[in-house]
Amino acid sequence: MNKKIIYCDGTFDLFHSGHIQFLKSCKEMGDYLIVGVISDENVLSYKRTPILSLENRVTILQHIDFVDEVVANCSFQPLSKDFLEEKKIDVVVYASEDGQPHWTDHYQEAIKKNIMKFIAYGKDNLSTSKIIEKIKHI
């Protein structure tokens, strides 16, 4: 039996329950979950410096029992056809507040292959940015 392989990527900074909800949603779509962790340098190209180091973020994800594989130092360049084929990825998942397509340039190959799924954040709509804003106002 072939396993259905799911891929998602993100910064996963200040890991919180919203991340868990997202990863569980991804895992429920298939049998094997690969999580890419965007490198610090690449994160800087679209938002602030991560609070936690790449090593810390990867370690957290490696200790989640339903995450099957963690790919460290992912580039936020477009996902390549080679990467999708090498990992035999069946579905690529991206979550946003509204569940609408964002970062479509990054996911162009997955969109072309019709394996892209955009979903909304979990029920608590929690994000690292919201946590940081809350801390600033304490």
Write out the residue ranges for each language-model feature.
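Nucleotidyltransferase catalytic core that binds NTPs
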Residues: 1-138
